[in-house]
Amino acid sequence: MRDNIIIITGITASGKSELCDNLIKKYGNISIVNCDSKQVYKEIPIITAQPPKQEEFYRLYGCVPAKENYSVGLWLEDLKGEVDHALENARMPIITGGSGLYISSLINSLSPIPKVSEEIRKNVSELRKNLSKEEFYKLVLSKDSKIQGKISTNDLHRLSRALEVITATGKSIFVWQESRQLPLFDNFKIYTILPKREDVYRKINSRFVTMIESGAVDEVKKLLNMNLAPHLPAMRAHGVPEIIKYLKGKITLSEAIQIAQTNTRHYAKRQYTWFKNQFPNSEVIDCANKLIEFEIF
């Protein structure tokens, strides 16, 4: 267990990366530990907006091959190692990122769900792809009645996870979630960055254009040439599916940009709702760099 852990989270394009750069300038002896489920993949630094390679300050960024199915359980193991390493070297760890499941598992502890086999994941992915939303929901409901009223028809990610778990273990994911381990840390301080929506949406639009100009298309082309399974997390990073459609000649680049921007804005909208409801004890900040004025340690 560790005390006084700082967590900086918030929606996508809220200014977390710029804030971290400024915190490094202010404090120096800190380690920024990644808490973004897509920024761990080393083949997609542009499309996931990873910070520059500065291993002295930034940890768990671009460290996992895209062919891997990195999980929250593996992240918690790696996180503990990075926090221990930072404290042993007189550096203060700051955990930052916008992956809600990662943050939630860190604070509330993780359910001890056994690992799901790659074969089951592929089978569920195929079912999700070949069935309509309504058909997929009915299928999952027929296997796990506990999802009723807890997972919506549109939440395909959570539906897929529920089907994977009950197929692999014979028990509902909600049964597993009732049995939790001890949290990793005793005390933590959470800062949640939630700027004005119009500012975030504008940043999302401009950031994706910058990604394209910085080589995101070539980056995704190399990823596509790896012939990875479409259900892998790296293949589902924001912007990747849209660029793949462009590379396959299904849509124009302009359409890919527009669709990716729209999908990311919709994701940000869902994040707003999620973060407002999940962490009642966090300190909400409407501008990331306001945190520079605080003494967070």
Swiss-Prot record:
Residues annotated for substrate binding in this entry = 12-17
- Catalytic activity reported: adenosine(37) in tRNA + dimethylallyl diphosphate = N(6)-dimethylallyladenosine(37) in tRNA + diphosphate
Write down the top EC class of this protein: transferase
Keyword Nuclease (UniProt): no
For molecular function, the Gene Ontology terms on record are:
ATP binding; tRNA dimethylallyltransferase activity
Question: Residues annotated as region Interaction with substrate tRNA?
Answer: 36-39
In its keyword annotation, does this UniProt entry include Transferase? Answer: yes
Q: Which Gene3D superfamilies match?
A: 1.10.20.140, P-loop containing nucleotide triphosphate hydrolases
Q: Which domain of life is it from?
A: Bacteria
A Pfam family the protein falls into: IPPT
Task: List site positions: Interaction with substrate tRNA.
Answer: 99, 121
- Matching InterPro entries, A to Z? Dimethylallyltransferase, IPT, P-loop_NTPase
The protein's Enzyme Commission number: 2.5.1.75
Q: Which UniProt keywords apply?
A: ATP-binding, Magnesium, Nucleotide-binding, Transferase, tRNA processing
Which biological process terms from the Gene Ontology are attached to this UniProt entry? Answer: tRNA modification
Q: Where does ATP bind?
A: 10-17
Q: Which cofactor does it need?
A: Mg(2+)
Query: Which HAMAP family does the record match to this protein?
Result: IPP_trans (MF_00185)
Q: Subunit details for this protein?
A: Monomer.
Family of the protein in this entry: Belongs to the IPP transferase family.
What is known about what this protein does? Answer: Catalyzes the transfer of a dimethylallyl group onto the adenine at position 37 in tRNAs that read codons beginning with uridine, leading to the formation of N6-(dimethylallyl)adenosine (i(6)A).
**Protein name as annotated:** tRNA dimethylallyltransferase
- State the organism of origin: Wolbachia sp. subsp. Brugia malayi (strain TRS)
